[in-house]
A protein has these predicted regions:
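A conserved helix-loop-beta module that forms one wall/lid of the active-site cleft
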Residues: 1-25, 286-293, 345-353
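Single conserved hydrophobic/aromatic residue that forms the stacking wall/gate
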Residues: 357-368
Length: 368
């Protein structure tokens, strides 16, 4: 396995040969980390095959739900993940229709989905998970069955896909059922996952290849930022409209974190950051207050959380396993019902939503 990992090149996705819900999956960034995980996890069951895949870092991920009668295939919905690839599809926030992909790429996705359904002779539902990196399309997996996104897609387009699929499997055709072309909803539909972290104090609060969510909510609006903000209000502590924001991100996220901090500052939020991130913010003209790391002294961010001095936390993990300090911060935030973003993509979408809510009319209802 170590030799194959060197051949494939890091980062890699390391997992048991058969898993459900991403159980036992790890994104591994170097050989030392891989050896540690293999010793701690896979040596428990010697002889169990281990699968290694090249991990496409910073790739966009897309879920496509289709229905086919064996002759005609219709796409029920295409959902773009808010987070980059690496977060389990059951945990990822998703936007329907896709919001950043080109029309050309979406057409490529459609044709690939039609071809897969035809070659696999699908009669019923099919889900395909794609990754897109550098304008190249990759197939992650194909499941000739109903996926967990079917209820969401059905509600978004107003078509009971599971009901249609059962009738198709009994011999009826899409033409007879009146569903012959893809429906693009006239609004944005955002799926956000609901997590049970407040029920399990001390559990790692981090999005990863292993699924942790126990439910989901839907945000609808004519504006994508507002739709995302609505989903956050329903799924977790609501996005704040004022206060101080603590930002601590890994090196790969710092460029985008600058734009996020600028956006929050323009909305009247105070910006808090550790020394390294704070220097970068100051260099870019952002007014920032430095906060001690947990190992550097006090007051640190946990002190501020306990004293209700923080209203939003943006904290992205470094590598596969969060450092102990990072986990303590996220755990304390959950205890105090503070909204926390653990991926830079989600943080960016949240800022967009806050910006629009600040300048728009009161939150409106969207009919489906």
């Amino acid at each position: 396995a170590y030799e194959r990992a060197e051949e494939i090149g890091f980062p890699i996705l390391l997992r048991p040969s058969f898993v459900l819900g991403g159980r036992g999956m790890f994104i591994v960034y170097d050989m030392d980390e891989m050896k540690k995980i293999v010793r701690e996890v896979f040596d428990v069951a010697p002889g169990t095959p281990v699968l290694l895949d090249k991990f496409l870092e910073d790739a966009y991920e897309l879920d496509v739900d289709c229905i086919s009668d064996g002759e005609r295939t219709v796409i029920g919905g295409m959902l773009q993940h808010v987070e980059f690839a690496g977060v389990h599809s059951g945990d990822a926030a998703m936007v329907m229709p896709p919001h950043t992909l080109s029309d050309e790429m979406l057409e490529t996705v459609r044709q690939a989905s039609y071809a897969l359904a035809k070659e696999l002779e699908v009669v019923g539902l099919m889900n395909v998970q794609y990754a897109i990196k550098d304008d190249e399309l990759y197939i992650i997996e194909v499941n000739p069955r109903a996926s967990r996104t079917i209820p969401f897609v059905s509600k978004a387009i107003g078509v009971p896909l599971a009901k249609l699929a059962s009738r198709i499997m009994a011999g009826e055709k899409l033409k007879d059922l009146g569903f012959t072309k893809e429906i693009i909803p006239p609004y944005w539909a955002v799926k956000e996952s609901v997590f049970p972290f407040n029920r399990f104090p001390g559990a790692p609060i981090m999005l990863s290849p292993e699924m942790r969510s126990t439910g989901e909510v839907m945000g609808l609006d004519k504006n994508i930022g507002v739709a995302f903000a609505k989903s956050q209000m329903a799924a977790k502590p609501a996005l704040p409209d004022s206060g101080d924001v603590f930002i601590s991100v890994k090196d790969a996220d710092k460029e985008r974190a600058v734009q996020i901090a600028k956006g929050l500052s323009a909305l009247g939020f105070g910006v808090l950051a550790t020394v390294g991130t704070g220097k970068l913010f100051k260099k870019n003209g952002i007014d920032v207050k430095n906060v001690c790391r947990l190992s550097e002294g006090r007051p640190n961010v946990i002190d501020l959380i306990k004293n209700n001095k923080v209203s939003l936390i943006i904290n992205t993990p470094q590598g596969t396993v969060p450092r102990q300090n990072e986990n303590e911060i996220r755990t304390e935030a959950m205890k105090h019902n503070i909204c926390i973003m653990t991926t830079i993509s989600a943080a960016s979408a949240a800022v967009d939503g806050l910006s629009l809510i600040h300048i728009s009319e009161p939150t409106r209802l969207t009919s489906i």
